[in-house]
């Protein structure tokens, strides 16, 4: 080899000095001709070595597209649906406590010798915590990943169920319920915000409807399951004991389920391929503070500055609160008026299960309507198209309220108010599903934060209605208490029409819709 190298620079060779320099340059660049074979590595070997020494640098903004092979939307359908199914079960689990508390409330009152309003604080603080939690957990999951937030939250949720099962006084129980609400809220934020991680907008409707069905299933099943309260052998504490056992199961499940946040998944994929992704912040104090600022402010910023989120949140302040209003109305109507047993009155919640199942079965039609609108719009999806069916279904909301109000007593059969409640559940559930799809379509990079900003007014409304309903039913007949809310609900269809016809104009005022939000994420180059 030495003789070959020497011969390249020998005076006896006919090559000029310039040729010698060219060959030397070729040797340096790894592109020498066949006469340099054996002197250095082949091109492919050299290129591989250079890639190892100088990894390819890719900007994160080029990797958020669903066209990337590592994007969770490109995973096998069975894997994606398994993840959604497990997370929907988790939503049923965390909603169990707040919706099941009504069935054990009288036992808690007797245990601590407190009034109904004081005992209801356990429920209302749980609801309030469920509204505040997503304001921090939503943004945190948008930058830190879904999986770590899930695990830590469910761990805290499980621990404080122990505190609720073995409280020394009612104050401890109320505080523990608030913390349970905060920790359990991650299921609502992460599932609703995580579905767009796994499904494109054209097919996200069905998994989102499954999530809504899971919410209804938890709300319906909890009062029925906590009917064990009437059995002295088990008692009210078993609501929390069961939560502790199931919580341990979900902690194991979370360890197995993969991360779904696209930026996290794609970055890991590229790093494994030896590429450097620009824009990922380093772990220094400045970047940590930037992340803390994002986590603590983004949810509130979106709620207060995004017109579409603010208007939808105010709508759901009333609409979601109505569901807790009916939780209270069930007992004076079916237990006191129609003389049903406690279990019989609890079983009336099954009407909501039927209504939610019908919504789930209808969702493929809703998706077809959305795709048809997209085709008519030259392949561009309009989030407002999510409300097409709602233009008609939302009319069931006030109609069902009035039916319940004026037929919730003899001589009308007990089935009549159940039908009215079902009509409200169909309209309310469908509107909620449309809004969740609308928000995740409009804010793909901040879906968790958007859902969180939307849910805070919703849970504040539920907190308020949990106490207002107690006052109304104590001072008014059931008929006029529900009728009062029915007259207010007349405005619901007009609000939905506003979203459909003017939503695009309202979205135009936003600085966070679509990929515009990328510059606000706590990335290194922002």
UniProtKB/Swiss-Prot annotation:
It comes from the Eukaryota. Residues 38-53 have a biased composition (Basic and acidic residues). It is a multi-pass membrane protein. GO terms for molecular function: pyridoxal transmembrane transporter activity; pyridoxamine transmembrane transporter activity; pyridoxine transmembrane transporter activity; thiamine transmembrane transporter activity; transmembrane transporter activity. Residues 1-53 are annotated as: Disordered. The keyword Membrane applies. The chain crosses the membrane at residues 81-101, 118-138, 147-167, 173-192, 204-224, 238-257, 314-330, 349-366, 387-407, 413-432, 444-461, 480-501. The gene is bsu1. Belongs to the major facilitator superfamily. CAR1 family. Thiamine-regulated, high affinity import carrier of pyridoxine, pyridoxal and pyridoxamine. Also imports, but does not export, amiloride and so confers sensitivity. One of its GO terms (cellular component) is fungal-type vacuole. It is found in: Membrane. The keyword rRNA processing does not apply. It comes from Schizosaccharomyces pombe (strain 972 / ATCC 24843) (Fission yeast). Coiled coil: none annotated. Keywords: Membrane, Transmembrane, Transmembrane helix, Transport. One of its GO terms (biological process) is thiamine transmembrane transport. This is Vitamin B6 transporter bsu1. InterPro entries: MFS (IPR011701), MFS_dom (IPR020846), MFS_trans_sf (IPR036259).
């Amino acid at each position: 080899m030495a003789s070959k190298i020497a011969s390249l620079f020998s005076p006896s060779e006919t090559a000029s000095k310039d040729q010698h320099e060219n060959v030397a340059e070729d040797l340096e660049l790894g592109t020498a001709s066949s006469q340099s074979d054996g002197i250095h590595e082949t091109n492919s070997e050299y290129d591989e070595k250079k890639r190892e020494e100088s990894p390819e640098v890719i900007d994160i903004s080029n990797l958020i597209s669903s066209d990337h092979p590592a994007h969770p939307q490109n995973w096998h359908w069975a894997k994606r649906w398994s993840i959604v199914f497990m997370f929907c079960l988790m939503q049923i689990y965390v909603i169990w406590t707040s919706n099941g508390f009504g069935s054990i409330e009288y036992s808690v009152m007797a245990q601590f010798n407190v009034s109904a309003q004081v005992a209801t604080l356990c429920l209302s603080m749980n609801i309030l915590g469920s509204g505040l939690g997503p304001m921090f957990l939503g943004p945190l999951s948008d930058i830190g990943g879904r999986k770590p937030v899930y695990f830590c939250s469910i761990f805290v949720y499980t621990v404080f169920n122990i505190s609720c099962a073995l409280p020394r006084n009612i104050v401890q129980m109320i505080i523990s319920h608030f913390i349970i609400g905060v920790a359990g809220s991650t299921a609502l934020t992460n599932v609703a915000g995580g579905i767009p991680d796994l499904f494109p907008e054209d097919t996200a409707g069905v998994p989102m409807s499954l999530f809504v069905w899971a919410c209804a299933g938890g709300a319906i099943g909890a009062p029925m399951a906590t009917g064990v309260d009437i059995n002295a052998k088990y008692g009210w504490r078993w609501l929390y004991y069961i939560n502790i056992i199931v919580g341990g199961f979900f902690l194991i499940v979370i360890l197995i389920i993969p991360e779904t946040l696209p930026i996290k998944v794609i970055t890991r994929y590229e790093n494994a391929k030896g590429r450097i992704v620009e824009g990922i912040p380093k772990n220094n104090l400045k970047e940590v503070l930037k992340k803390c600022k994002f986590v603590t402010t983004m949810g509130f910023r979106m709620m207060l500055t995004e017109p579409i989120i603010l208007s939808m949140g105010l709508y759901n302040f009333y609409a979601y609160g109505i569901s807790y209003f009916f939780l209270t109305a069930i007992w004076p109507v079916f237990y006191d008026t129609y003389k049903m047993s406690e279990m019989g009155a609890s079983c009336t919640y099954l009407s909501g299960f039927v209504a939610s199942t019908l919504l789930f079965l209808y969702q493929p039609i809703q998706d077809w309507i959305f795709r048809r609108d997209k085709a008519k719009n030259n392949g561009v999806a309009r989030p407002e198209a999510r409300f097409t069916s709602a233009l008609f279904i939302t009319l069931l909301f006030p109609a069902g309220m009035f039916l319940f109000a004026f037929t919730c007593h003899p001589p009308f059969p007990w089935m009549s108010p159940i039908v009215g409640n079902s009509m409200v559940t169909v309209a309310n559930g469908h509107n909620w599903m449309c809004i969740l799809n609308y928000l995740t379509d409009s804010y793909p990079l901040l879906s968790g934060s958007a859902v969180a900003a939307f849910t805070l007014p919703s849970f504040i409304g539920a907190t308020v209605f949990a106490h207002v309903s107690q006052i109304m039913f104590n001072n008014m007949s059931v008929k006029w208490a529900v009728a009062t809310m029915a007259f207010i609900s007349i405005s619901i269809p007009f609000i939905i029409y506003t979203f459909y016809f003017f939503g695009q104009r309202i979205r135009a005022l936003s600085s966070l819709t679509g990929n515009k939000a990328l510059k606000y994420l706590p990335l290194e180059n922002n």
